[in-house]
Amino acid sequence: MASATDSRYGQKESSDQNFDYMFKILIIGNSSVGKTSFLFRYADDSFTPAFVSTVGIDFKVKTIYRNDKRIKLQIWDTAGQERYRTITTAYYRGAMGFILMYDITNEESFNAVQDWSTQIKTYSWDNAQVLLVGNKCDMEDERVVSSERGRQLADHLGFEFFEASAKDNINVKQTFERLVDVICEKMSESLDTADPAVTGAKQGPQLTDQQAPPHQDCAC
Amino acid sequence: MAQDASLSSFQESEWEVILPVLYRDRAVQNVEEERIRKLKTRLQQLRWRGAKRGGQEYAEKSCARCRRALGLLLNRGAVCQGCSHRVCSECRVFPGRTRVWRCTVCYEGRNVRIKTGEWFFEERAKKFPTEGRQETAGARLLQSYQELSKISVVPPTPPPLSESWCSSSPGRLQELSQPRGFNKSVENLFLSVTTHMKKLSKSQNDVTSDKQLLSTSPEQGTGRPERRSQSDTAINVTARKISAPDILQSLSPESPKRPANPVLKQENLLSHPTPGPLFSGGSRQGSLISINSACTEIGNFDNADVTGEVELALRYCFKTRSLEVCIKSCRNLAYGEERKKKCNPYVKTYLLPDRSSQGKRKTGVQKNTVDPTFQETLKYQVEPAQLATRRLQVSVWHLGTLARRVFLGEVIIPLASWDFGDSTTQAFRWHPLRAKAEKHEDSSSPNHGELTVRAKLVLPAGTSKLQEAQEGTGEEPSCDGQLCLVVLGAQNLPVRSDGTLNSFVKGCLTLPDKQKLRLKSPVLKKQACPQWKHSFVFNGVSPAQLRQSSLELTVWDQAAFGVSDRLLGEARLGSREDPAGGAGSGSHSKLQWQKVLSSPNLWTDMTLVLH
Ligand SMILES: Nc1nc2c(ncn2[C@@H]2O[C@H](COP(=O)(O)OP(=O)(O)OP(=O)(O)O)[C@@H](O)[C@H]2O)c(=O)[nH]1
Ligand SMILES: [Mg+2]
Ligand SMILES: [Zn+2]
Ligand SMILES: [Zn+2]
């Protein structure tokens, strides 16, 4: 007699996670400083002079190979406009690192850095890694914020500092890679303090032999 | 509250831009959770290996990890500083270049804390002790949003009733009632947003015009669409990544720019034999292209007059089970931008019918040439049996400014008749490019996705002689044949507005005497590309019977609380002509079905187009 039976079919699971770990990064800063451009330069190697202000939030995923590890980066691009602040700050908590950006041709965006930094302190974890980036360093003629002031502020806030240009692709990759490295360092620290036996004896994703990026400030 | 005002002033058009981002994020999160779950399972298994087994005495002098006996003088073992267990020399790991070691479990434990991001959640918990680890901001926003806005915001196509039912299932309610550190006020804000929006959508006429302004169609001359990293349509693509069929595991195309140590890279490929991440491909090589190609799949691209040819070779490596498409060059291409005489060509391939981004491969972009040389090999990991069901689509595109794409022509190579054993077919050949061939096929019979199944007719030894079975005259040779059908998975299903489905498959075998055998798979929740891997077994059927039977497979989206399930698509195999089915696909699956019946005890893989 014909009959029918169901049964589970065991098959090896496909793992489609070709990376070792995932970092979440947030880009913040005033509107029009070039956050979206910076991300597009990094992820797609593209740049467009047109300004389309970001609505709310957006992200891109990019996997990089660093320190013998594949690291998947989920990079969040936030809207600089005030009206989206409620949404964007909701993302601070999930971020391991931040790129805080201002525009070297825009004094106001530089003055806002302190406020952005306070936002990070409020909404993010205590060890949040932050890189301060002065963008648009290709526009030397219109510069109003000197490198020196940028660096001083960064020192004051305890952030690392880069000048960069999304347009001319200066220091874009370096910024992200440095941020990844400092997150890795934090990660090792955090793991080693949790495992007292290895304190002092560094292991795992250590980056001590990582030399400093070629030029942190803009050469132009 | 000041923020309240800012949030509730959002327009529907703004949400239309934000929501897809939230959905995409959720797809990324799903993949991530799956990965983490696996890592933890592996660690657990490692622990169990060392655990004391029932009945077995816990010998003091044995390795805590592998249970190997330890000697008194030789091979005494040593104490792991991580867990204070004594382990043998085999079960130690020396990470990095240091002399400090850990036992395998401690080492793996540390690894898992790195790989899962656990270290971060632990650190974060110091500041936000109530924060759950899984829920991301996006998930919460989405949840609140969906919970409250469904009726007014979601387009009416999917049954809104069943959705709101689903989302108020007990599990969901529970989650909501424990916002775990999530700013309660934000949820309230969403409430006000949605009420606000309801008003908007009812009364305000300018919503539509806003929509146009913010529309994500890349055809609009404005920069915005291009700037979005994914258009709306990409949600499904993203979600698809969650569960790609194993049978088509992609090898990410070689990216020479990646500064990878080749050995390490190999290792990684072996340990995770799976596609490179969707959005990145691991390197710069044109993630711009992948990002927008979702648009090109739905027709948002320009067309050039098609000219020229593409030179390529096809090889199948049986050892690695990979199809290699070697794209050498093109000649005499049309200009992507005729007026400016500009052309930046690249080549993209799919193994049809899979049009998901999983199955997409691309070459690099050549600049300013209509006779580009690529010399690139695009690889697909695919089982030999699958090849026969596939067609290779090779299309050539121009990448213009602002990521605008222009279609330059394509060629479709059916692989069913391709002889991969014959070396002459492996030579490079020129294929003339043609205009898009498939438009009509897609529009004439709406495609509701594809279902991949594997079927086998099991006959007891001795009765498998085909002739006997085929005739079916006089004495039936045997009635104890068995039809095994494994429903592997589906993709490109018409998903709900939230990008997922609670799907299941029904199988109904109608025998010649009109007797119907029905089977049903379990429901897979919240997945856009379900992988049921469920097998249906129809017992006591003879080949002769089957020849006059039809098997109907239907895919459903389950509705909660008695609201009727939504039919997503159906495919039919067997004798009865499918009146609705498209001619092309119908005859193809017919051939496949005949193959199942005529080759007993062998698995046949099929990709069925759902209608
Ligand atoms: N010259 C120059 N222009 C840049 C650079 N980066 C961005 N821009 C331009 O600055 C404008 C604003 O860039 P966006 O990236 O959209 O700014 P944003 O920070 O994302 O702004 P919001 O989304 O509103 O927060 C655009 O017109 C860009 O083309 C740069 O490095 N150099
Ligand atoms: Mg922006
Ligand atoms: Zn051992
Ligand atoms: Zn140990």
Swiss-Prot record, chain A:
A lipid is attached at residues 218, 220 (S-geranylgeranyl cysteine). Belongs to the small GTPase superfamily. Rab family. Interacts with RIMS1 and RIMS2. Interacts with Rabphilin-3A/RPH3A and Rab effector Noc2/RPH3AL. Interacts with SYTL4. Interacts with RAB3IP. Interacts with SGSM1 and SGSM3. Interacts with SYT1. Interacts with MYH9; this interaction is essential for lysosome exocytosis and plasma membrane repair. Interacts with STXBP1; this interaction promotes RAB3A dissociation from the vesicle membrane. Interacts with SNCA. Interacts with GDI1, GDI2 and CHM; phosphorylation at Thr-86 disrupts these interactions. Detected in brain. This is Ras-related protein Rab-3A. GO terms for biological process: acrosomal vesicle exocytosis; axonogenesis; calcium-ion regulated exocytosis; establishment of localization in cell; evoked neurotransmitter secretion; exocytosis; insulin secretion; lung development. Switch 1, switch 2 and the interswitch regions are characteristic of Rab GTPases and mediate the interactions with Rab downstream effectors. The switch regions undergo conformational changes upon nucleotide binding which drives interaction with specific sets of effector proteins, with most effectors only binding to GTP-bound Rab. It comes from Rattus norvegicus (Rat). A motif (Switch 2) lies at residues 80-96. PANTHER family: LD44762P. Regulated by guanine nucleotide exchange factors (GEFs) including RAB3IL1 and MADD which promote the exchange of bound GDP for free GTP. Regulated by GTPase activating proteins (GAPs) including RAB3GAP1 and TBC1D10B which increase the GTP hydrolysis activity. Inhibited by GDP dissociation inhibitors (GDIs) which prevent Rab-GDP dissociation. Interacts with MADD (via uDENN domain); the GTP-bound form is preferred for interaction. It catalyses: GTP + H2O = GDP + phosphate + H(+). Changing residue 36 to N: No significant effect on interaction with RAB3IP. A motif (Switch 1) lies at residues 49-58. GTP binds at residues 31-37, 48-49, 53-54, 80, 135-136, 138, 166-167. GO terms for cellular component: acrosomal vesicle; axon; cytosol; endosome; lysosome; perinuclear region of cytoplasm; plasma membrane; postsynapse. Phosphorylation of Thr-86 in the switch II region by LRRK2 prevents the association of RAB regulatory proteins, including CHM and RAB GDP dissociation inhibitors GDI1 and GDI2. The modification Phosphothreonine is found at residue 86. The modification Phosphoserine is found at residues 188, 190. It is a lipid-anchor. Residues 194-220 are annotated as: Disordered. The gene is Rab3a. The modification Cysteine methyl ester is found at residue 220. GO terms for molecular function: ATPase activator activity; ATPase binding; GDP-dissociation inhibitor binding; GTP binding; GTP-dependent protein binding; GTPase activity; myosin V binding; protein-macromolecule adaptor activity. Its EC number is 3.6.5.2. It is found in: Cytoplasm, Cytosol; Lysosome; Cytoplasmic vesicle, Secretory vesicle; Cell projection, Axon. Its cofactor is Mg(2+).
